[in-house]
Amino acid sequence: MNDEQQNSNQSENTKKPFFQSLFGRFFQGELKNREELVEVIRDSEQNDLIDQNTREMIEGVMEIAELRVRDIMIPRSQIIFIEDQQDLNTCLNTIIESAHSRFPVIADADDRDNIVGILHAKDLLKFLREDAEVFDLSSLLRPVVIVPESKRVDRMLKDFRSERFHMAIVVDEFGAVSGLVTIEDILEQIVGDIEDEFDEEEIADIRQLSRHTYAVRALTDIDDFNAQFNTDFDDEEVDTIGGLIMQTFGYLPKRGEEIILKNLQFKVTSADSRRLIQLRVTVPDEHLAEMNNVDEKSE
């Protein structure tokens, strides 16, 4: 027997007693609580029976049984709504700027508790080849699934799988919308953050839509905005570009309102009753040239 075979046999011999101990504790009913089960799982990792990712996934599955939908939902203030009277171009701009695939649709901008349906972004694709005048948003809406904040996350996952839907609107005890939850939100509790092609851009807060236009999150730091657009907005009184826009207006502007600051045009593309969410910034040619000159010098 060579050394490699001997080492392999020794490794197998050390694993067998652990396996026997592990399964023995399962089948003999020695595990009395969750803490003991977690201990066994972590022992399994230390003995190289499972890797770190597997251990974290197992623990994630165990943890979702203790979570409620309110613990993982996207809060109401971060939901991007579409109004059922918006035209095709407005809907497309909202979809492009947010990079989401599903949107709650409301009948009245001042009543966000009255959600009339869910719009799937893919349902708009056919209108790119058809006459926009035949566009009827109401005909594209999917049914709304309503769930209470107190619903258990593991039951929510079961419903997502069995009923084959991916988004639910979360309401509080009074029936008011408090947030939304997606199947991705639950899966991230199990496997960790799921990054898609848009996540890096969302983290950056600023996303270029065309040569002259940018989608900018209202929470973008003024310093980051200045660095991107070669501006010198003061951050002594406010920290974010959304705060600066509100300060300049003197009130909370509604979606669609515009203002020009330092040759840049700011348009509110998403807002709720408490804060700004998303802005569209249009850069004129002369300022674009200044931005390009700064980029060339930095290189």
Curated annotation (Swiss-Prot):
UniProt cross-references to PROSITE patterns, sorted A to Z? CBS
A single Gene Ontology molecular function, please? flavin adenine dinucleotide binding
- List the signal peptide residues: none
Superkingdom as given in the UniProt entry: Bacteria
Would I find Magnesium among this entry's keywords? yes
Spell out the SUPFAM superfamilies in the cross-references: CBS-domain pair (SSF54631), FAD-binding/transporter-associated domain-like (SSF56176)
GO cellular component terms?
A: plasma membrane
Q: Which CDD domains match?
A: CBS_pair_CorC_HlyC_assoc
Pfam families referenced in this protein's UniProt entry, alphabetically: CBS, CorC_HlyC, NMB0537_N
Occurrences of domain CBS (ranges): 73-134, 140-197
Keyword check for Transport: yes
**UniProt entry keywords in alphabetical sequence:** CBS domain, Cobalt, Magnesium, Repeat, Transport
The protein's role, per its UniProt record: Plays a role in the transport of magnesium and cobalt ions.
Annotated family: Belongs to the UPF0053 family.
- Give the protein's recorded name: Magnesium and cobalt efflux protein CorC
Q: Report the source organism.
A: Haemophilus influenzae (strain ATCC 51907 / DSM 11121 / KW20 / Rd)
Name the encoding gene, please.
Answer: corC
